[in-house]
Amino acid sequence: MMHMTFYWGIKATILFDFWKTDSWLSYILTLIACFVFSAFYQYLENRRIQFKSLSSSRRAPPPPRSSSGVSAPLIPKSGTRSAAKAASVLLFGVNAAIGYLLMLAAMSFNGGVFIAIVVGLTAGYAVFRSDDGGADTATDDPCPCA
């Protein structure tokens, strides 16, 4: 039976039926894995935000206006932008998947797993994202699954 409240034991099932902890060694390895994946989530979020800001800053300047005040062309070329957009979308998808897996791991209601995830997210933010100068104000969300 699955726990519906926080508990503090070493026996836990994380994400899959085959990922069960029944000893201190397996439990500590699980906590380390949760910590590492949480920090990796913040690393990917940082890469995604930096990639997005780089791709938006590389946009070509607008074409010069004609004498009538209309700029041309109406539809910009999208050769390199589509590749950058596809990479950005892929990074977002991987980041979202990791975030949802972290959320599901926290829903095991094991106190140690929950703390390992929160500490991993905090450490990852401190290492990878704390010096980004507020560039992520629109995406600064404490929920790792969004």
Swiss-Prot record:
Gene Ontology cellular component list: Golgi apparatus; late endosome; membrane; plant-type vacuole; plasmodesma; plastid
Q: Report whether Magnesium shows up as a keyword of the record.
A: no
Pfam hit, one: Ctr
Molecular function (Gene Ontology), one example? copper ion transmembrane transporter activity
Listed A to Z, the keywords are: Copper, Copper transport, Ion transport, Membrane, Transmembrane, Transmembrane helix, Transport
Sequence intervals crossing the membrane? 24-44, 101-121
InterPro entries registered for this protein in UniProt: Cop_transporter
Location(s), subcellular: Membrane
Q: Is Nucleotide-binding given among the entry's keywords?
A: no
Region of interest (Disordered), ranges? 55-74
- Main localisation, per the record? membrane
Q: Please give the record's induction comment.
A: No change in expression levels after treatment with high concentrations of copper.
Family from the record? Belongs to the copper transporter (Ctr) (TC 1.A.56) family. SLC31A subfamily.
Database matches in PANTHER family: COPPER TRANSPORT PROTEIN CTR1, SOLUTE CARRIER FAMILY 31 COPPER TRANSPORTERS
UniProt protein name: Copper transporter 5
Native species: Arabidopsis thaliana
Q: Which gene encodes it?
A: COPT5
